[in-house]
Amino acid sequence: MGFMKRATFALGLSILLLFALPALAQSNAAEEAQHRAEVLRSLPQNAARRLFAVPASPAQLPAGAIGAYGKGCAAGAIRLEPDGPGWQVMRPSRARNFGHPKLVASIKALAAGAQQDGWPGLLVGDMAQPRGGPMLTGHASHQLGLEVDIWLTPAPAGRRLTLEEREEMSAIDLVQPDLLDVYPERFTPAHLALLRRAALMPDVDRIFVNAAIKQAACRSETGERGWLRKVRPWEGHTYHFHVALKCTDPRCGNRNSIPAGDGCGKELARWFREEVRFPKGKRQPPKILTLADLPKACGQVLAAP
């Protein structure tokens, strides 16, 4: 990267770090513990979310992704170290820094490439539990060990966060309250480069961001636009982007294929309708899955040493 590009990155990141907000992007350790306790009190004993929250180590089985992204489990997952060259794991008390070996390798590759682009370091959010499966809090997917949330906040340059900071600090919200656009001073060329690099990784199936962030990427990209196809609008995702890898395990099912094109036209515009941004009415609570709702092999994953 040339001097002028690096200078632009540095300026953008310096501005971004001035806008850290007090509102938490994710629950801190105490809030998470309280939420988990409340969920556990309400769940039946056979709820899959309860069962998969117990194991503290991965299943000693060959690595595999079993089932669907929102109804499955992970065999032979490995742990992403809390610290590495170019990344730091956030909210480590959750023990959600596990994934398929392909996911761990992809995170490390993204961290290395992003540093070359001038991003100081990745702050890695939730991956999967040691054996995947449904989680007590926070996610409908993240069950196969093939997904990771990457904060849209860069790591501080030149230092490691303390354990307290990792448990307590907030990510930075890039999207304005009306959900119609990003804050122009917060979405920087560095963010565009990070999303581009992630989308161009061959194992990545798709990336979820808020529609306002997708829109900002669409209008900011002046070069080759094919990578934008993988960047998909979704509700929330104003503080982080969600990376999902392709599943090559015959025991799992991939999502539907992504439509052709860069996704910057009519299919994006619908996300800015008021009824989509702020839906009215109560949502039906999701079905409480039991182990019987998951693939049979997930029982073997739970029972494995």
Model regions: which residues?
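Sec/Tat signal peptide C-region and signal peptidase I cleavage site
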Residues: L21-A25
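Bacterial N-terminal signal peptides
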Residues: A10-A20
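Extended, low-complexity, intrinsically disordered C-terminal regulatory tails
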Residues: A48, F52-P55, S106-T137, F208-K230
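Acidic/His-rich structured neighborhood in mature extracellular/periplasmic domains
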Residues: Q129-P184, V243
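Extracytoplasmic
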Residues: D117-W119, Q143-E147, T238-H240
